[in-house]
C-alpha cells in the first residue's frame, strides 16, 4: 500500500487537505450527536457520507493507504450504527484520535515526507480491533 513519493500529487493533496479535515471533523461531530440520541440514524448516515467524501479525495490525491485507513474509521462508525459497538466515550475518543492522526499524517506528506501508510498502523489496528 505504500506509494512511491513521486506518485503523490502533493499540490492536489494540499488543495484537498482542508476538505478532508473538514469532512473528518463533520463526521466526528455527527457521530457525537448521534451518540447523544442513538435512535436517530440520520446523523450517523451523514457521518458515513462525510467519510466517503474524505476517502474519495484521498484516492484522487494518490493516497490509497490513507483512503484505506478512512475505511477502518467508516467500519467503526458502521459498527456503532448496527449496535455492534456501544457509543462509549472511549470509542468516540478513538474516532477523534483517528481523525487527528490522519490529519497529522497528511500534513507530513504535504511537507514532503514519503507517503508511508504504515505510520498509520498503530491507530488503524485499534480501529479494526474495536470494530
Identify the role of each PLM range:
Residues 1-10, 84-131:
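Structural secondary-structure packing elements that flank or coincide with functional cores
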Residues 5-49:
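Long, amphipathic alpha-helical coiled-coil segments characteristic
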Residues 15, 22, 49, 56, ...:
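DHp/HisKA dimerization-phosphoacceptor four-helix bundle of two-component histidine kinases
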Residues 21-24, 28-31, 35, 55-58, ...:
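A structural signal for well-ordered alpha-helices, especially hydrophobic packing surfaces
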Residues 43-47, 60-76, 90-98:
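Short, well-ordered alpha-helical segments
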Residues 72-75, 79, 118-123:
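Long amphipathic alpha-helical coiled-coil segments
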Amino acid at each position: 500500500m505504500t506509494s512511491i513519493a513521486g506518485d503523490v500529487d502533493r499540490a492536489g493533496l494540499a488543495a484537498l487537505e482542508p476538505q478532508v479535515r473538514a469532512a473528518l471533523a463533520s463526521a466526528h461531530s455527527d457521530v457525537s450527536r448521534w451518540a447523544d440520541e442513538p435512535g436517530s440514524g440520520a446523523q450517523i448516515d451523514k457521518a458515513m457520507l462525510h467519510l466517503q467524501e474524505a476517502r474519495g479525495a484521498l484516492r484522487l490525491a494518490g493516497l490509497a493507504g490513507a483512503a484505506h485507513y478512512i475505511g477502518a474509521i467508516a467500519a467503526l462508525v458502521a459498527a456503532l450504527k448496527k449496535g455492534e459497538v456501544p457509543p462509549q466515550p472511549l470509542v468516540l475518543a478513538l474516532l477523534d484520535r483517528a481523525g487527528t492522526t490522519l490529519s497529522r499524517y497528511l500534513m507530513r506528506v504535504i511537507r514532503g515526507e514519503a507517503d508511508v501508510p504504515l505510520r498509520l498502523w498503530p491507530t488503524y489496528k485499534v480501529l479494526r480491533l474495536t470494530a
